[in-house]
Structures are given as structure tokens and as C-alpha cells.
Amino acid sequence: MQENSTEIYDDKNRRLKPLMWVAMVSMVMLFGGLTSGYIVTKADNFWVNFDLPDMFMVSTLLIILSSVTISMAVKAAKASEYGRVKVAVLLTFVLGLGFVGSQYMGWTQLVDEGHFFVGSLTDIKGEYGVDYTIAYNGESLLYNGKDFYMPQDDEFKDPIDPKMFGSFNTSSSFLYVLTGVHIAHLGGGLLAMLVVLINALRMKYNSEDSVGLEICATYWHFLDGLWVYLYLFLMFIE
């Protein structure tokens, strides 16, 4: 019986884990392309620099904590501790929902500050130099309270406003795309986590078979690491 269970476990590993790794490699390529595009676009034309929403820090803490709880679930399953598996998976699912909620609150803050998915430079609210700055071809612009000027034009003789007319706030668009695509993939992770939660409540994970839980945990850790990368990238690139 033990040998048969081991064979089933190994068979599931062979069938499911390669699919998971293919999905994760594809995501690495996708986000690598998006962040590369971010860097290239930032150095060209107008670019708005602003602080990330405070709720994104909350998102980071929640998803890191969820990685801890899903690891606890896997450890509990290896020991056939059904009760701990249920609690740990449930906590992970709740923390995942909290992450989504905090992201939504972060987007709400962006909208309140005039940073829209498709918006112009004139939509931005706040004090220039404190809440945001604008760069042109990599150079931060000067602002005299009325018009914008290139940094070398310290006597404010040649305003650059005509070039700014009709320009989009590309930086906020990139922010929505990066976080939105991550949320979309995390949504898939939450659906998988829901299936795992149902199985955990039915006490299906134990020392002999926890493949589904392990695969979900690996994918969840990946999403965690991906978000931390995006958060640090966005925080320091700004």
C-alpha cells in the first residue's frame, strides 16, 4: 500500500510540476519585458516621478506573511497534522484576499492623486517637488509656480509647457499594468488556493500525498517573490 501511494505521488509530480515551471518561466519573461520597457520609456520624453501608495507596503507585508503560512501548511501536511493544514491554508487564502484589497486601496490613492491608467500630465494633483516631479529625457524639470523649464534654464526664459501639452502620464500607466498583471496571475493563485483549501478541509493532504498543496505553495512563493521584486523595482527606480 505504501509503495502504491509513493508511485501515485511520483506520478503527480512528473505530470504537474513541469507545467508549473513552464508557467513561471513564462511569467519571468513577461515581467522582464515589462520592466525593461519601463526603464527604456523612463529615459525618453516626459516621465512623472512620484511615491508609491502607502498601501503597497501593506501589500508587501501581507504577501510575505502568506508565504510563511503556506510553508507552515506544507510542513503540517508532511506530518499528517490535518488541523494545522486547514488553519494554515485558510490563513494564506485570507491573506491573499487582503493583498488584493490593499492593492485596490493603493489604486484608489493613485486616482485621488490624479494618476490614472490613461491620464495626462495636467491631471496630476499635489505640490510639485514634494508630491511629484516631472523629467524630460531623463532631466528633472524646474517649476516656478506657473510654467516648467529645463534644468539649465535657471532664469526661466524658455518654458517647456508647449511640448508637455497632450503628453500622457506614462509612468502611472506602467504602474497600473505591472500591478494589474501581477494581480491577474495572483487571481489564478487564489483560485488554486481555494481548491487546496477545500481539499484541506476534506483532509486530503498528508505525509503520503501533498502534491497539490506543494505545487500551489511553490507557485504562491513565486508570486510573493515576484511582487517583492516589483515593489523594490518601482520604489528604487523612481
Regions found by a protein language model. Give the residues of each.
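...captures the hydrophobic TM-helix bundle architecture rather than a specific catalytic motif
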Residues: 1-238
